[in-house]
Amino acid sequence: MARLVAVVKYSDEDYPFEKRQMPLYIDDSLTMVLEFSDNMLNLDKQQIDTVQLEQFIQHHKMLTEQDLTAALTVTSREVFNALSQLLPCVGCRRCVERLFSQVMQTGIQALDPLSVGANGVLTLSHSFMTDATKLYTLFYVCGSKLNSMIDTIAKNKKGKKNNRCKFHSLDVRKPKPLGGHWMDVWEVMSPECRDEVALIDSNCLLETLENYLQKHRFCADCKNKVHRAFNILTGELDFSKVKGYCANVYQGLRCCPHEGHIHLCCETDFIAHVLGRAEPEFAGGYERRERHAKTIDVAQEEVLTCLGIHLYERLHRIWLKLRAEVQTRQMLFYLGVDALRKSFEVTVEKVQGISRMDQYFKDILEEEKVQELKQEKKRQKKNRRKNKTSCDLPAPHETKSANASQNNDPPGFMESGGDSCNTSEDRNMCAEVTVKNEDLLRSHKMKKGLTPHSNVSDCGYSSSLEGSEPGSQEGSDVACAEGICKHDEAGDDEKDEEEGDSCVECWNNCTKDNIKGKSKKKKKKCKPFKCENENTLKQVPYNTESSDVHSNPNEENKVFNFCMDSEFPRRPWIYHRNEFFSDMSSSESQMRETKSLKELLDESECSSQEEDEITQDDIQAFKETYQTFYRDRQQFRQCLKENFKQFCLHRNPSLLVGKTGAIN
């Protein structure tokens, strides 16, 4: 707590202020010396964090003496910038700026251990620089009170619109009902200060008396009696010549006629008695009404009341100045400590090689790198999908060349590396055709879960290996032509095959070779389909209009005769199917050249990065471009089923009874 320890006389212009002392200006006639205690650094060990203190000591040892001196030096601009941001009260800001300028100009050590140089630089004393414990206590124990002090100032504002604190508002300058204020300021005064406060100037007291008489509208006679009582107090009138004078009323008062002073007894009880007479005046007990002083003793009491009013106003002014100056000094002290602490922390971080801001930016950059890495992985994944799609999609010219090669190849050509039919026994037509989904659907997309050669959805009549296994693998021309009937694997390779249809033999041998055939699915040889005629096969022209024959149920015999007519050599149904698709592809080649499915897919954009399917727009465009595809495909499938059924009934109707499930 600050104390008033001395009075500065006008003759003592160069008063020797000690550490933590500063002048307190009360009025034109009174200036006191305000002293602050140094017990702020004498703290209990429980208030100090041991772990944080050890860390601070390590940071303190990292700095050299030169670095420490530079770190514990801040300019006035840094202090004033923090001041304008933290303090809402205009009066507090002006008082802090005034005190900073006063300390800088006079050189007083009011902010010890802080000091302000002539150039306006705030620094710390050498004893605190070298002692890490004191420095820690100053920064993190005393300096932590800044926020609480600012909160206190904000709470003491007078009204929501008024940003001034209670010490700098206009209302506080008016005297209020007596309370403990005068006692608080009276107790922190030294005897010298009390004597100075108890010394009342006669002219000031007379001015207070005139205001009092005017306020209560005393009559002229009563005013004269009050003035006579005042003259007796000041020694201008001999009390022995005044009738009705009471000496007990002025007990404890002493006047100096030559100097014009009135001395009051400095005892606390007497001061309380004098102030007690003026309490009704501040509490509102006396209304503005006409008052009288008919006798001298009553006039003496009125003078004593005015003396109490004057003393209370003086004590209230001292209390207000004292509290405002203490708040100003503490605010400037805490602002300086906070600025030094920040400068010290910045210097320590620079010595360590990384600052908090750099660490923050580093964390942000790491997060951005992680996000970029994720985006790069997504782009690579998308590119892999796109490349895979491009590889799976056959080019238009490749499809053309493949169809042309199939049409130009000799009838006895084997695609998958089967044995050529060079012997006389095997001069019959041998053909192996691998029909893929790409050839049927003209698309690079496949159904999920199916291999490129899969036709599982063909209901047992598919030409692929996987599609025929669950359905009509045994006893069908398709299975025999595909090489999955396993005649060769059953041990019949050494026998010469008899003339006629080999599929009939498949029906007879399928039961025996069923188990052996299933164990050899990984490697299947192609067995040529023998035709009944050994003559060389001729190219049979096929027109797409023949699809009408397949679509007509009444012309099933014509279709059968077309395949088995004696004018033409016996041909496997695979051959007719190749001719069908070859002609159909040639008729639609011009349309595909206009815009292929690959071009449609390349033009379309994926709606999302994770899209794996063809969009509905692409499917709709494909259907509009190839309108005859599904119709011809269904007609061909129906024709194939009917041909196979008629073939089985014509050759061996008894076998069809037990194999109905395989056919259907």
UniProtKB/Swiss-Prot annotation:
Instruction: Establish whether keyword DNA-binding is in the entry.
Output: no
Q: Keyword rRNA processing on this protein?
A: no
Q: Where is this region: Disordered?
A: 375-425, 447-476
Residue ranges annotated as compositionally biased, kind Polar residues, are 452-475
Instruction: Supply one GO CC term from the record.
Output: cytoplasm
Give the keywords, sorted.
Cytoplasm, Developmental protein, Differentiation, Spermatogenesis
Report the domain of life of the source organism: Eukaryota
PANTHER family according to UniProt = GAMETOGENETIN-BINDING PROTEIN 2
The entry's protein name is: Gametogenetin-binding protein 2
Q: Which organism is it from?
A: Xenopus laevis
